[in-house]
Structure formats: C-alpha cells, structure tokens
Amino acid sequence: MQLSDPLGDLLTRIRNAQRSRHATCVSPASKLRANVLEALKREGYIRGYTSEELRPGISQLRVELKYNDGEPVIKEITRVSKPGRRVYSKIKELPRVYAGLGVSILSTPRGVLSDNEARAANVGGEVLCRVF
C-alpha cells in the first residue's frame, strides 16, 4: 500500500504506541524518517531507534519510546507541513513551541534539525512537525 504522507504515518504510530504504553513501535524505513528520529533522539524525546532488514531492499525502523515515571515523554506530536500544504519558515520567523518547552523539527539545507539547532546554524526550512 502506498502512503500519501509517510512522515505523518510515523508520527501517528509513535503517538498511538505511547498512548498504549508500548515500549517500542515499528515503522517502514526511509531516510527522512530516520533523520527525524535522529533529531528526536538528540532532543531526548526517544531512547533510540534501530534499522532492521526484513528482506533484501525492505527495512523497518524500531523506535524505542521513552517514559518518565510511567508517563510518555512526548505529550504532543503533530505534523505541521503536510503534502497538501507545505509550511516554510525563515529562522527569524520560527515561533517557539510552548515558549521553548517543546521543539519544532525542520528540514533544512543542512539536514533535519531541531529548531534550537537551526537557530544555532542560522538556517530556516520546511517545518515538519512540533513535539512537546
């Protein structure tokens, strides 16, 4: 089955797994998904992720979810830029998520970065999602 929004599918899988208190969730692999997961790992929202090859040419990502005293670390994870409506932001116009308590994940010319990393690198880009 072809997905129209693979990144939205990953975010929904993470959201549903955390609501069900699962330790891990599985998603089909892609470079964009792996880069977003790497940004979430750097920001401390997930424990990590691994790539598993099911058969030659077909891989999946196993995401290790993070909990704090039994509560999910990710309270809210939403898609901002969608296939039908792309959202781009200059770094000066990028709003802070919950007054800096959350992060935005951006696709920039320097790769997929959190809003804090993008501000430090002084680059804007497509706002992929918000995490709190």
Swiss-Prot record:
Q: Which GO terms describe its molecular function?
A: rRNA binding; structural constituent of ribosome
Q: Does the keyword Glycoprotein apply?
A: no
Gene Ontology cellular component? ribonucleoprotein complex; ribosome
Query: A GO biological process this protein is involved in?
Result: translation
Which UniProt keywords are present, listed alphabetically?
Ribonucleoprotein, Ribosomal protein, RNA-binding, rRNA-binding
A Pfam family (short name) is Ribosomal_S8
> Which PROSITE patterns does its entry note?
RIBOSOMAL_S8
Q: Does the keyword Ribosomal protein apply?
A: yes
Could you describe the subunit structure of this protein?
A: Part of the 30S ribosomal subunit. Contacts proteins S5 and S12.
Q: Which family does it belong to?
A: Belongs to the universal ribosomal protein uS8 family.
Q: Its function? A: One of the primary rRNA binding proteins, it binds directly to 16S rRNA central domain where it helps coordinate assembly of the platform of the 30S subunit.
Q: Extract the NCBIfam families matched here.
A: PRK00136.1
Indicate what this protein is called per its UniProt record: Small ribosomal subunit protein uS8
Its source organism is Granulibacter bethesdensis (strain ATCC BAA-1260 / CGDNIH1)
